[in-house]
């Protein structure tokens, strides 16, 4: 359990319920979230920002933009619930903002799965200072 939490801290971002986000990414991609996406490209990970390097990195960019649109909850602190039914993520919140937060995380997990073919190991530990400024969300 502790290992999964540590992995989650290094995930696509520090925002959101990291435990749930990590589980979603693992369920959708089959990849270790911290190792595969914790510092991927210009947008995945804690310090992520910049012009996306590829479609995988673009998933992380869109995820950060999704978080910026949330109002009424704190993606850095608030937790949500979801279930995994028939290999599908189902967000199960009554609170509209927490449901949107869950949907943001669901979208990035699905996007990463759909773009597994663009995953490039050379971007796994990409140095963020070399990233160019991205367009605003």
UniProtKB/Swiss-Prot annotation:
Known outcome of mutating residue 123 to W: No change or important decrease in myotoxicity when injected into mice. No change in myoblast membrane permeabilizing activities. Decrease in bactericidal activity
Modes of activity regulation: Suramin inhibits both myotoxic and muscle-paralyzing activities. Chicoric acid inhibits myotoxic activity. Zinc ions inhibits the myotoxic activity and the neuromuscular blockade. Heparin inhibits myotoxic activity.
Variant or mutagenesis effect after changing residue 63 to Q: No change in myotoxic activities. No change in myoblast membrane permeabilizing activities. No change in bactericidal activity. No change in calcium-independent membrane-damaging activities. Shows no hydrolytic activity
Location relative to the cell: Secreted
Any GO MF annotation of the entry: calcium-dependent phospholipase A2 activity
Superkingdom of origin: Eukaryota
Residues the UniProt record annotates as site (Cationic membrane-docking site (MDoS)): 128, 133
Chief localisation class: secreted
Site (described: Important residue of the cationic membrane-docking site (MDoS)): 121, 124
Stretch list, region Important for membrane-damaging activities in eukaryotes and bacteria: 121-133
PROSITE patterns according to UniProt: PA2_ASP, PA2_HIS
Effect of residue 118 to A: No change in myoblast membrane permeabilizing activities. No change in calcium-independent damaging activity against EYPC:DPPG liposomes. No change in calcium-independent damaging activity against EYPC:DMPA liposomes
Key words, A-Z: Antibiotic, Antimicrobial, Disulfide bond, Heparin-binding, Myotoxin, Secreted, Signal, Toxin
Consequence recorded when altering residue 53 to A: No change in myotoxicity when injected into mice. Decrease in myoblast membrane permeabilizing activities. No change in bactericidal activity. Important decrease in calcium-independent damaging activity against EYPC:DPPG liposomes
PANTHER family xref list: PHOSPHOLIPASE A2 FAMILY MEMBER, PHOSPHOLIPASE A2, MEMBRANE ASSOCIATED
Protein name per Swiss-Prot or TrEMBL: Basic phospholipase A2 homolog bothropstoxin-I
Species of the source: Bothrops jararacussu (Jararacussu)
